[in-house]
């Protein structure tokens, strides 16, 4: 089994030293879902929500969150992201919104946390914008879909819906 990288020999939390690592292209994708009543989703789709464009606001929030991950998650490195993408898709069949984020950089550490943070904060933003019309929306699951680059190799989540 792998070791926890953020715990030192004394069992204390610490920031991982990446100074000796090679710079490689690293990319991660994550997804999150927000499930809601069909009426709430319809307001988002037809643009009748009184707070404005829910998807545009959630997209911007997700992008901003990816850029601030180092400030939100202890022990994350500040990264020079070269690409952050947040896509939102209304899924009327399941009465939910699917959020997929992509983060990419050329650097010494991965971007999994940035991708997960982008998807999570976009989901939280949808909740925030729609809570006046529905408070029992459900956020989740949130998960890493893919990761590439770096010493630990590539990862691809099992597909399920």
Swiss-Prot record:
This is Cyclic pyranopterin monophosphate synthase. It holds the Pfam family MoaC. The lineage of its organism: Bacteria, Pseudomonadati, Pseudomonadota, Gammaproteobacteria, Enterobacterales. SUPFAM superfamilies: Molybdenum cofactor biosynthesis protein C, MoaC. It comes from the Bacteria. Its EC number is 4.6.1.17. Homohexamer; trimer of dimers. Pathway: Cofactor biosynthesis; molybdopterin biosynthesis. The gene is moaC. InterPro entries: MoaC, MoaC_bact/euk, MoaC_sf, MoCo_biosynth_MoaA/MoaC, Mopterin_CF_biosynth-C_dom. One of its GO terms (biological process) is Mo-molybdopterin cofactor biosynthetic process. GO terms for molecular function: cyclic pyranopterin monophosphate synthase activity. Substrate binds at residues 75-77, 113-114. Belongs to the MoaC family. Keywords: Lyase, Molybdenum cofactor biosynthesis.
């Amino acid at each position: 089994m792998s070791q926890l990288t953020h715990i030192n020999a004394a069992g204390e939390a610490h920031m991982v030293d990446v100074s000796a690592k090679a710079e490689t292209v690293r990319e991660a994708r994550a997804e999150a879902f927000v499930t809601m009543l069909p009426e709430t989703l319809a307001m988002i789709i037809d643009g009748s929500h009184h707070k404005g464009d829910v998807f545009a606001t959630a997209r911007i929030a997700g992008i901003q969150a990816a850029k601030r991950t180092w400030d939100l998650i202890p022990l994350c490195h500040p990264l020079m992201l070269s690409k952050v993408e947040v896509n939102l898709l209304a899924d009327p069949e399941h009465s939910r919104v699917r959020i997929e984020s992509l983060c990419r950089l050329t650097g010494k550490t991965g971007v999994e946390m940035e991708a997960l943070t982008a998807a999570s904060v976009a989901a939280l933003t949808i909740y925030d914008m729609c809570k006046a019309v529905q408070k029992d929306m459900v956020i989740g699951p949130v998960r890493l879909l893919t990761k590439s680059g770096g010493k630990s190799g590539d990862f691809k989540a099992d597909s399920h819906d």
